[in-house]
UniProtKB/Swiss-Prot annotation:
Component of the ubiquinol-cytochrome c reductase complex (complex III or cytochrome b-c1 complex) that is part of the mitochondrial respiratory chain. The b-c1 complex mediates electron transfer from ubiquinol to cytochrome c. Contributes to the generation of a proton gradient across the mitochondrial membrane that is then used for ATP synthesis. InterPro entries: Cyt_b/b6_C, Cyt_b/b6_C_sf, Cyt_b/b6_N, Cytb/b6-like_sf, Cytochrome_b, Cytochrome_b_C_euk/bac, Cytochrome_b_N_euk/bac, Di-haem_cyt_TM. It is found in: Mitochondrion inner membrane. This is Cytochrome b. Keywords: Electron transport, Heme, Iron, Membrane, Metal-binding, Mitochondrion, Mitochondrion inner membrane, Respiratory chain, Transmembrane, Transmembrane helix, Transport, Ubiquinone. Heme b b566 binds at residues 98, 197. Heme 1 (or BL or b562) is low-potential and absorbs at about 562 nm, and heme 2 (or BH or b566) is high-potential and absorbs at about 566 nm. Its cofactor is heme b. The cytochrome bc1 complex contains 11 subunits: 3 respiratory subunits (MT-CYB, CYC1 and UQCRFS1), 2 core proteins (UQCRC1 and UQCRC2) and 6 low-molecular weight proteins (UQCRH/QCR6, UQCRB/QCR7, UQCRQ/QCR8, UQCR10/QCR9, UQCR11/QCR10 and a cleavage product of UQCRFS1). This cytochrome bc1 complex then forms a dimer. Heme b b562 binds at residues 84, 183. The keyword Acetylation does not apply. Belongs to the cytochrome b family.
Length: 380
C-alpha cells in the first residue's frame, strides 16, 4: 500500500500531528476554543495591519493625515482600519478568557506552556501599546508620553533609558518611527512564540475540565474539534464585523480624533479598556516607583501561579470555595477596569486602592489558604 502523504511528508506530518490526528480529550468544553480564536485574531491582525502599513506614513507631520486618507480614499480603508482597531479588543477579550480558563482549570501546571503563554501576553501588551501611538492623535501622544515616562522611575538609569527610548527629550518623530518598526516586528515574534507555546502544549497534551489524566479516552482533533473551532471562528468574526460596521468607535477615545498637540494635555489621560485594570493598580499607589512595581507585578504575578497551587485537585470543578474566590477575583478585575476609566478623585481613589490590595491578597494569600483548607476537608 502507498504511504499516506499526510503522515509521511516532512512538513505535512507536522501539520497532521498538530491539527488532524492530534489525540484530544473527549470532554473539553467551549472554554478550550479560545486558543484557536487567538490564532485567528493574530492572522486577522497581521493581514489588516499589513494592508494599513501600505498606506501609513510614520512621520509626525503626516501620520494623522495618512490614517484619515486611508479611511477616506483607500478602497475599504475605513473597514480595514475598523477591523484592525476592534480586532485588538477581541484579541484581548480572547486572551483574558483563555488565561481565566487556564487559571480555573489548573492548566498552569504545564509550567512551560503557561510561562510561554504569559510571555505571549506581555508581547501582545507591548504590541498594542506601540500600535495605539501610531495614529498620532491626542491620546496616542499623551498615552505614549505617560507610559514611557514610567521608566524614568527606575533608579539611576531611568532618565537615560527614557531619553534613549524616545530618541530625544520628548515623544517626537524618532519615537513614532521606532514605534512603527516595533509594531511591525512584534506580531511576528508573537507568531514565533505561539509555535513554541503549541510545541510545549503538544508535549503533554491538553488539560480537561476534570483535571484528570485522559489518555484512556482521546479522540482525533479532526473532525470533532476542527468543526467546533470553526463554529467559534464564525461567532467571533460575526461579533467583530458587527462591532466594526455598526459602532466602530465604541471602544475608542474621542480625544484621538484630535491630532497630537504637545501643548495641550487632555483632561483625562487613560489607555484603551484592556489596560485599565493595570492602569488602576498603577494609579492607586501615590509613589512613582511603587506604582511602576505594582503595575509590573499585576501581570508578572501570573508567573507565580504554578508555585501557589497547593490543592490536591488540579481544577476548581469540585472546589466550591476556590470557585467563589475565582469569581471574586473576576469581579475585582472588573471593578479595577471601571475605576481605571474614572478621574482621580474621591471616591474612586479609595475604591482603586482597596481593589488593588484585594487583587494581590486573593492571588497570593487567599487561594493557597483556601486550597489547604479544601485539602483538609477531603479527609472528613
Amino acid at each position: 500500500m502507498a504511504p499516506n502523504i499526510r503522515k509521511h511528508h516532512p512538513l505535512l506530518k507536522m501539520i497532521n500531528n498538530s491539527l488532524i490526528d492530534l489525540p484530544t480529550p473527549s470532554n473539553i468544553s467551549a472554554w478550550w476554543n479560545f486558543g484557536s480564536l487567538l490564532g485567528i485574531c493574530l492572522i486577522t491582525q497581521i493581514l489588516t495591519g499589513l494592508l494599513l502599513a501600505a498606506h501609513y506614513t510614520a512621520d509626525t507631520t503626516l501620520a494623522f493625515s495618512s490614517v484619515a486618507h486611508t479611511c477616506r480614499n483607500v478602497q475599504y480603508g475605513w473597514l480595514i482600519r475598523n477591523l484592525h482597531a476592534n480586532g485588538a479588543s477581541f484579541f484581548f477579550i480572547c486572551i483574558y478568557l483563555h488565561i481565566g480558563r487556564g487559571f480555573y482549570y489548573g492548566s498552569y501546571l504545564f509550567k512551560e506552556t503557561w510561562n510561554t503563554g504569559v510571555t505571549l501576553l506581555l508581547t501582545l501588551m507591548a504590541t498594542a501599546f506601540v500600535g495605539y501611538v501610531l495614529p498620532w492623535g491626542q491620546m496616542s501622544f499623551w498615552g505614549a508620553t505617560v507610559i514611557t515616562n514610567l521608566f524614568s522611575a527606575i533608579p539611576y538609569i531611568g532618565q537615560t533609558l527614557v531619553e534613549w527610548a524616545w530618541g530625544g527629550f520628548s515623544v517626537d518623530n524618532p519615537t513614532l518611527t521606532r514605534f512603527f518598526a516595533l509594531h511591525f516586528l512584534l506580531p511576528f515574534m508573537i507568531a514565533g512564540l505561539t509555535l513554541i507555546h503549541l510545541t510545549f502544549l503538544h508535549e503533554s497534551g491538553s488539560n480537561n475540565p476534570l483535571g484528570i489524566v485522559s489518555n484512556s479516552d482521546k479522540i482525533p482533533f479532526h473532525p470533532y474539534f476542527s468543526l467546533k473551532d470553526i463554529l467559534g471562528f464564525a461567532i467571533m468574526l460575526l461579533l467583530l464585523t458587527t462591532l466594526a460596521l455598526f459602532s466602530p468607535n465604541l471602544l475608542g477615545d474621542p480625544e484621538n480624533f484630535t491630532p497630537a498637540n504637545p501643548l495641550v494635555t487632555p483632561p483625562h489621560i487613560k489607555p484603551e479598556w484592556y489596560f485599565l485594570f493595570a492602569y488602576a493598580i498603577l494609579r492607586s499607589i501615590p509613589n512613582k516607583l511603587g506604582g511602576v512595581l505594582a503595575l509590573a507585578a499585576s501581570v508578572l504575578i501570573l508567573f507565580l501561579t504554578p508555585f501557589l497551587h497547593k490543592s490536591k485537585q488540579r481544577t476548581m470543578t469540585f472546589r466550591p470555595l476556590s470557585q467563589l474566590l475565582f469569581w471574586l477575583l473576576v469581579a475585582n478585575l472588573l471593578i479595577l477596569t471601571w475605576v481605571g476609566s474614572q478621574p482621580v478623585e474621591h471616591p474612586f481613589i479609595i475604591i482603586g486602592q482597596m481593589a488593588s490590595i484585594t487583587y494581590f491578597i486573593i492571588i497570593l494569600v487567599l487561594f493557597p489558604m483556601t486550597s489547604a483548607l479544601e485539602n483538609k476537608m477531603l479527609n472528613y
